[in-house]
Structure formats: C-alpha cells, structure tokens
C-alpha cells in the first residue's frame, strides 16, 4: 500500500521491495546506525549499495537506499542495512508484526535454543531449535556465505519473500532479537 502525507510505522515482518533488483523481502528490524535511522533485511534480496527500497511493493513509498550490503563470496552474514531517507513518511518501531516487542539481543544463541521467526507470506509465526553455529552455505550456487546459524524448523514454513524476516527468542523478559532469516534449506529434514 502506498503511504502518502501520513506517518507509517516500519516494523519487523513488513513487506519491503528492492525495486532496483525487483525483489520482495521482509523487514527484520529497525534501529539506528551512526545516529541515522535504518532498517535491516537480507543481503541476498539486493545487488549493491544505493539500491532503492520501497514499502510493500514497487508502487509504495520510497523508504530509502541500501547503505551497507553483505552477500558476496567470502562474506560473513547475509544482510543489508537500509538508510531511511523518507523520515517525513516513516517512523520506526521495535515490534515484530505488532505482537512482540524487541527488548534486547541474543547474538549468539546456543545449540538447542528455541528460536521463533515470522513468515510474512503466511502471516504466521514458526519456531525451531538451533542446530549449529558458524555455518557456511553455498548461496546462489556460487558464493560461500559464512557465520550463519542453522535452525531446524519444527513448526511453520518459510517461503520465497520471507527472507530478511526476524529471528528471535521469546523470553519471559521480552523478545530477544537473534538475526535475519536467510531461508535456505540444507536438507530435507527441515534444517
């Protein structure tokens, strides 16, 4: 949906589109980088810094441009940081789909930790357990991306367009942000 002359709130789980790469993905979380408001999503949904990111679809309002892009052979992680340049239209929230508020981070979840994620394409939450850490995968049949955490999904599904979405731990003290959904299956058992 196009948002004009009003403040729209960006939050984890929202649909965003890289119009330069013609790719829809999911917003992971909002924050700031060097004092600048930003959003975080997957790196494999884009091509390079300065790609244009829009809210919802290619006809939506422009959010901003890719500021930092990580998704090349030998990179650690699969993410990009988008600088919000349209601050007259967009505000940010630390919530995930208006259901969970991010109260902190869990940057190194231990093996066995139960992790939740949000599937934008099915409008549902799923979960799984951390199987391995610091995993390297062959992405797009050509690039080795390392530093990933492998989660065995035991409930829910991940579809095309869910990439970039939030992974988090649902703790009694609030949701702890863990990272960005990469969405690559490593085998047929749900990993």
Regions of interest found by a model, annotated:
Residues 8-147, 169:
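Serine endopeptidase catalytic core focused on the charge-relay Asp
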Residues 139, 144-153, 176-191:
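Membrane-proximal bilayer-interacting regions
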Residues 22-24, 152-155:
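Short, Gly/Ser/Thr-enriched beta-strand-loop segments that form substrate-interacting elements
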Residues 46, 122, 174, 185-187:
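Residue-level marker for beta-strand->alpha-helix junctions and adjacent short loops that shape enzyme
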Residues 1-6:
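Autoinhibitory propeptides
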Residues 156-180:
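Catalytic nucleophile loop of clan PA
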């Amino acid at each position: 949906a196009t948002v004009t002359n009003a403040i729209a709130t960006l939050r984890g789980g929202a649909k965003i589109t890289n119009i330069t790469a013609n790719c829809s993905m999911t917003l992971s979380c909002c924050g700031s980088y060097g004092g600048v408001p930003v959003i975080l999503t997957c790196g494999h949904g884009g091509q390079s810094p300065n790609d244009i990111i829009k809210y919802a679809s290619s006809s939506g309002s422009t959010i901003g441009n890719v500021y930092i892009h990580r998704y090349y052979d030998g990179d650690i992680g699969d993410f990009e940081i988008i600088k919000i340049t349209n601050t007259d239209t967009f505000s940010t929230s630390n919530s995930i789909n208006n259901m969970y508020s991010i109260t902190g981070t869990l940057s190194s979840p231990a093996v066995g930790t139960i992790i939740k994620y949000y599937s934008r394409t099915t409008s549902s939450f799923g979960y799984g357990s951390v199987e391995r850490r610091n995993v390297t995968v062959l992405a797009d049949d050509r690039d080795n991306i390392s530093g990933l955490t492998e989660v065995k999904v035991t409930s829910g599904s991940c579809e095309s367009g869910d990439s970039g979405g939030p992974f988090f731990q649902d703790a009694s003290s609030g949701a702890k942000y863990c990272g960005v959904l990469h969405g690559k299956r490593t085998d047929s058992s749900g990993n």
